[in-house]
């Protein structure tokens, strides 16, 4: 079998490497990239040129993109699950991966962005995600076998991610969650941990090398109080040891990287230290500044207090991540999408309007960070692509 052990980001003792060398980088979320490919291949929709989007990302110096590598709603799972339709689904995935290879942009592939999709498709309740014998689990394992097996040899796949912010559902009492036994209880952390172990092991059976993360948000600052009370007590705020426990909940073996979206900056140093103690990598999968609609930075910070606040908050975030030595960060978001089939090419942050980056300070800030990493031997992406394409 072809050796793919040097492809993508690897994590050892909490350190990210690319092509055998320590790696640090700042990329973007391109949430709808596969959705746009499915629109084109399955539905014949040519309103949006996905290649143009990816080409402009490359021209903007973006090294990688976090992508929903699946479908969002259960009503679209049939595009892959029904065998007679799978060839078209593969064609759309092939298109995305080939474009990433062509323009030398790595993919953080989020396999099950919306955990409900496969449950809704087969009629399972959400607690059954931790049951290895449930119908939805078996279907997910088939998806892992198919997709991870198909693309493990591509240098465009930099990391596998299981989902998106599932931890925010844990111990919440206001979600209307009902178990498969008809019990009205919160969705529990133990379901999340069990689910990650099942999917993580399936990924590792096929790809023992690439970075593997759950895709979570930063822990709720009272997650331990919620955990101990099953959602009935909201105080006190987490201690350092409580945060350490939370990071372990969200990164059970064989996962090697903990994801934190929108972390409070006052806790970043602590999260970084805890990750090092646990020998896991830390990935800030989503962040953005204060939202202010100002396409192409038409108003300067001197002209607009709102623009100044947005730029100041964004730069403070990125500076904090860099000072804490975070290996990988991805800005939210390049291009937006209704999560159905309506293309909306406008975005409030690093968005696209016909492929034009709206907030230029974000592009420039990302380039500044990546240039720093490259100059200091922390991001030799050019060598990676030349060695592996």
Residue ranges, per PLM feature:
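Active-site mouth of glycoside hydrolases
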Residues: 2-255, 261-271, 277-280, 287, ...
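Fungal extracellular Ser/Thr-rich, low-complexity intrinsically disordered regions
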Residues: 380, 387-388
């Amino acid at each position: 079998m072809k050796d793919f052990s040097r492809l993508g980001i690897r994590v050892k003792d909490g350190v990210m490497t690319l092509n055998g060398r320590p790696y640090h980088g700042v990329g973007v979320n391109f949430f709808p990239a596969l959705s746009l490919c499915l629109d084109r291949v399955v539905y014949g929709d040519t309103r949006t040129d996905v290649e143009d989007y990816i080409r402009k990302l490359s021209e903007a110096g973006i090294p990688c993109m976090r992508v929903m590598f699946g479908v969002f709603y259960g009503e679209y799972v049939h595009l892959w699950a029904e065998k007679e339709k799978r060839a078209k689904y593969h064609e759309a995935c092939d298109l995305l991966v080939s474009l990433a290879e062509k323009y030398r942009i790595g993919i953080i592939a989020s396999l099950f962005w919306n955990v409900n999709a496969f449950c809704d498709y087969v009629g399972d309740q959400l607690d059954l995600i931790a049951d290895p014998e449930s119908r939805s689990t078996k279907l997910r394992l088939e998806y892992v076998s198919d997709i991870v097996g198909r693309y493990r040899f591509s240098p465009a796949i930099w990391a596998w991610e299981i989902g998106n912010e599932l931890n925010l559902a844990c111990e919440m009492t206001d979600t209307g969650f009902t178990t498969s036994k008809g019990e009205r209880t919160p969705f529990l952390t133990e379901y999340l941990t069990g689910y990650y172990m099942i999917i993580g092991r399936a990924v590792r059976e096929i790809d023992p090398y690439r970075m593997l993360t759950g895709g979570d948000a930063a822990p709720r600052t009272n997650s331990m109080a919620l955990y101990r009370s099953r959602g009935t007590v909201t105080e006190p705020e987490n201690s350092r040891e409580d945060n350490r426990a939370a990071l372990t909940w969200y990164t059970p073996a064989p996962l090697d990287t903990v994801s934190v979206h929108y972390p409070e900056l006052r806790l970043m140093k602590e999260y970084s230290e805890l990750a090092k103690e646990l020998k896991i990598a830390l990935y800030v999968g989503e962040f953005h500044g204060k939202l202010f609609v100002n396409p192409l930075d038409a108003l300067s910070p001197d002209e607009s207090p709102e623009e100044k606040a947005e730029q100041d908050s964004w730069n403070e975030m990125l500076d904090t991540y860099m000072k804490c030595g975070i290996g990988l960060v991805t800005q939210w978001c390049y291009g937006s999408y209704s999560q159905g089939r309506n293309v909306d090419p406008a975005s409030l942050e690093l968005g696209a309007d016909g492929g034009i980056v709206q907030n230029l300070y974000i592009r420039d800030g990302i380039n500044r960070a990546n240039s720093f990493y490259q100059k200091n031997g922390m991001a030799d992406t050019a060598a990676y692509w030349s060695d592996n394409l």
